[in-house]
Amino acid sequence: MLSGNGQLDANKWTPFINSQTWTTYILPGLWGTLKSAVFSVILALVMGTALGLGRISEIRILRWFCAVIIETFRAIPVLILMIFAYQMFAQYNIVPSSQLAFAAVVFGLTMYNGSVIAEILRSGIASLPKGQKEAAIALGMSSRQTTWSILLPQAVAAMLPALISQMVIALKDSALGYQIGYIEVVRSGIQSASVNRNYLAALFVVALIMIVLNFSLTALASRIERQLRAGRARKNIVAKVPEQPDQGLETKDNVNVDWQDPDYKDLKTPGVQ
């Protein structure tokens, strides 16, 4: 069927050799994808951190409030959030009409991914040994200091793979903006295919671009994770203090008594030589 429609012909790929195809369709769409993904990921990290910390707060009302927000926006599909935001922004003139689709895409991606990141953060902190928090409190640190200085850095390092996976999801979900007229790489690829009648080639190029983006993001995350682990390993190195001749018998590892020593006296049974 594809060969009958000419989709497998070599001339269907020639438009991608022409720079006009890239400057008119692909590159503007790629910029739209990257722009919406970067903005939404940054806002989702801020939102997720705030909701995640509120989720483990000692204030009960704050915990309930954050839990309601998290569970609500995690349950709503991203596309519905985008359509809702688009209609709301247009109805009340919240954003300029030229930025309407972009704002709706960022809103949908931020609310959904921020809620997921908040739950990832909460579970990451909850998985840490309780002894660390107890030790910090015993040292006189407040609950806030314990969370920011002890628990949060470890939780972020532990949940980094899950965070990167969520960022990849945000990057791919930006393609849903096609439904509300947002110019991103999938929409641009389809527009290019409509002009050149090469749907298979255009979709293949778009898929290849998304694969390269996701692979690059995953590789960057893996490198950051290795650096974090190496940094923690360097911090955990304990230098061994060399023993001094007059150190004395301070630990059981340093005690080496010769039971055949004639000068040894058993303190439990006085008089025994």
Swiss-Prot record:
Residue intervals passing through the bilayer: 26-46, 64-84, 100-120, 150-170, 200-220
Region (Disordered): 242-273
Keywords: Amino-acid transport, Cell membrane, Membrane, Transmembrane, Transmembrane helix, Transport
Domain ABC transmembrane type-1: start-end pairs: 30-221
The UniProt record lists the keyword Transport: yes
Any one biological process term the GO annotation gives: amino acid transport
Protein name, per record: Glutamate transport system permease protein GluD
Gene: gluD
